From Swiss-Prot:
UniProt xrefs under Pfam families: DHO_dh (PF01180)
Keywords per UniProt: Cell membrane, Flavoprotein, FMN, Membrane, Oxidoreductase, Pyrimidine biosynthesis
Topology class, membrane: Peripheral membrane protein
InterPro entries in the cross-refs: Aldolase_TIM (IPR013785), DHO_dehydrogenase (IPR050074), Dihydroorotate_DH_2 (IPR005719), Dihydroorotate_DH_cat (IPR005720), Dihydroorotate_DH_CS (IPR001295)
Function: Catalyzes the conversion of dihydroorotate to orotate with quinone as electron acceptor.
Name this polypeptide is given: Dihydroorotate dehydrogenase (quinone)
Gene for this chain: pyrD
Organism of origin: Mycobacterium ulcerans (strain Agy99)
Length: 360
């Protein structure tokens, strides 16, 4: 059924469809009885899926990745869609319109998306008001980025301002320095630039702070960010963002679509490589959230056993439909029981022994 609906929706402009579907989801989950029924039906109910990560209780490991609900207008929706948590944003200290349209494209042969949205959002202040007025049934993290018009030498203050506004209201914060769609943003991943930003955010809030990195970083840069995160006492790392690589794409005409980051299966291999490298580097000293190309329960299981405590998806949700998160959670629960694991935590990094144990 969803395959037919998706085929029809894919005849329409991607960003228009996103707004339409998001509005339908919000409307369908607006009534409390309906929302509760959907949460019981679609949500992760098997206790083996639950875990406590950086002091926050997650009913299931799969969350909605940042980018879908940029302004937190669906805070009451995501539990009812079966997610164990949601990450909203990216929000910036000041409202901004993002890049000119068209800025979102489908790559159907690759089951992928290309976007150059550019952090379009209503600002951290507007999100803070929504967070204060709602009490979602699942944890909600907030992804913060740099305002486009803020010079790089003022980035610290920009991130600090966002952290001040949304930090007290979020389950966790993610410092996004890895989107390819804000000029110069990825340069902030260099440790000499990243250190003062992370230190400022940590000083501003007691909420757990993570950093989101790009799949296009070199291995040595991944190591440096990991070491910095441990040194500063971050809660974890989100790996990875979208890729600017166009290698191996099957969809014709991608070169004519212009700049942007690609999400979905094309980033899966590198995302898993980065996850494994991070786990070997930091072990359980940091929480690792894996995102990028997760489509099936087997994909999710590979990430968990490689060291991810939590997972995220966006493109998989677009191509998989409303039952996607339920299928992922059900598949993870099945693998946990089959493997004799008493909890999700026991399975995290369980395949690391085949590649050498991480430091403890």
């Amino acid at each position: 059924m969803y395959c037919l609906l998706r085929r029809l929706l894919f005849l329409l402009p991607p960003e228009w469809v996103h707004k339409l579907v998001f509005a339908v989801l919000r409307g369908a989950t607006a009534a409390t009885p309906v929302r509760r029924m959907l949460t019981r039906w679609l949500g992760p109910t098997d206790p083996v899926l639950a875990s406590t990560v950086f002091g926050v209780r997650f009913p299931g490991p799969l969350g909605l990745a940042a980018g879908f609900d940029k302004d937190g207008t669906g805070l009451d929706t995501w539990a009812a869609m079966g997610f164990g948590y949601a990450e909203v944003g990216t929000v910036t200290a000041h409202p901004q319109p993002g890049n000119p349209a068209p800025r979102l494209f489908r790559l159907p042969e690759d089951r992928a998306l290309l976007n150059r949205m550019g952090f379009n959002n209503h600002g951290a202040g507007a999100l803070a008001i929504r967070l204060a007025c709602h009490h979602p049934e699942v944890p909600v993290g907030v992804n913060i980025g740099k305002t486009k018009t803020t010079p790089a030498d003022q980035a610290v203050d920009d991130y600090r301002a966002s952290a001040r506004l949304v930090g007290p209201l979020a389950s966790y914060l993610v410092v996004n320095v890895s989107s390819p769609n804000t000029p110069g943003l990825r340069d902030l991943q260099a440790v000499e630039s990243l250190r003062p930003i992370l230190a400022a955010v940590l000083a501003e809030t007691s909420t757990p702070v993570l950093v989101k990195i790009a799949p296009d970083l070199s291995d040595s840069d991944v190591d440096e960010v990991a070491d910095l995160a441990v040194e500063l006492g971050l809660a974890g790392i989100v790996a990875t963002n979208t890729t600017v690589s166009r290698d191996g794409l099957l969809t014709p005409g991608v070169g004519q679509l212009g700049a942007g980051g690609i999400s979905g299966p094309p980033v899966a291999e590198r995302s898993l490589e980065v996850l494994r490298r991070l786990y070997q580097r930091v072990g359980d000293r940091l929480t690792l959230i894996s995102v990028g190309g997760i489509e099936t329960a087997e994909d999710a299981w590979d990430r968990i056993t490689a060291g991810a405590s939590l997972l995220q998806g966006y493109t998989g949700f677009i191509y998989g439909g409303g039952l996607w998160s339920k299928h992922i959670h059900d598949g993870i629960a099945r693998r946990l029981h089959q493997g004799g694991f008493g909890s999700l935590h026991e399975a995290v990094g369980s395949n690391a022994a085949e590649r050498g144990r991480p430091p403890s």
